[in-house]
Design a protein with these regions (language model features):
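Short alpha-helical segment of the dimerization/phosphotransfer core of two-component systems
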Residues: 45-50
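Short conserved segment of the HATPase_c
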Residues: 105, 160-173
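A conserved beta-strand-to-alpha-helix junction within the catalytic ATP-binding
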Residues: 71-85
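Conserved micro-motifs of the catalytic ATP-binding
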Residues: 65-70, 109-113
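Short helix-loop "hinge" at the ATP-lid/N-box region of the Bergerat-fold HATPase_c
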Residues: 127-129
Length: 221
């Protein structure tokens, strides 16, 4: 199945790139017909969405089999978390999401891949920005627990999720209440696979509309 996904994704990329290039050329033309301009805009948005889906499929396929390059170095999770959070200020502000960050003064030093850890944080925060109930708080805790570093993300979902955390992690499975939001639904699955190739663990807990993601990594000290 993984090989099939990879092959199909590669086969789609070539004609899709051609479509995107032609749409770009059309957008540069001086078109007076407002309906035609609107159609071109739809083509541009949907082709970009399809491109992102293909990229997610390829990454999910590689990550699920562990077929990714991993360069482990000593990192401080708290610093990288704060940096990634800073990139979401604008998105969270649009939904009036208030981040409550509770970060330990202790260093959370782990052996991990900087690029993959960033992608894990990015996918989790992107999921929150899409599905969290507007005008609510997002709680993020980063702490030491024995020989482990733990980072948890908690938010209130827009709608109750009538599935378990395990079901949500299944590829291509998303709660019915989320289907009106664009996206591949692969973000958390990719985050889980990338966490595991770095010897970490990602768990999801769902209780009604309460959504929690917890990351655990062995401390390198």
């Amino acid at each position: 199945k993984t090989e099939l996904i990879t092959n199909v994704s590669h086969d789609i990329k070539t004609p899709l790139t051609s479509i995107i290039n032609y749409v770009d050329l059309l957008e540069k033309e001086e078109i007076e017909n407002e309906t035609a301009k609107e159609y071109i805009g739809v083509l541009s948005r949907q082709s970009a969405r399809l491109k992102k889906l293909v990229e997610d499929l390829l990454e999910a396929s590689k990550a699920s089999t562990g077929n990714v390059n991993v360069n482990l170095t000593q990192l401080e999770l708290g610093i990288l978390l704060s940096q990634t959070l800073g990139e979401y200020d604008e998105k969270f502000s649009k939904s009036n999401l208030q981040v409550v960050l509770n970060k330990t003064d202790d260093l959370l030093l782990v052996m991990a891949d900087n690029r993959h850890i960033w992608r894990v944080f990015d996918n989790i925060l992107n999921n929150i920005s899409k599905y969290a109930q507007p005008n609510t708080r997002v709680y993020i805790d980063a702490k030491r627990n024995g020989k482990m570093a733990e980072i948890s993300f908690r938010n209130i979902s827009k709608d109750p999720l009538n599935i378990s955390g395990d079901e949500l992690m299944e590829r291509f499975v998303r709660g019915d209440s989320s289907r009106n939001t664009e996206g591949s639904g692969l973000g958390l699955s990719i985050a889980k696979s990338l966490t595991e190739v770095q010897k970490g663990k990602l768990d999801i807990q769902i209780d009604g509309d309460l959504f929690k993601v917890q990351l655990t990594f062995p401390l390198s000290e």
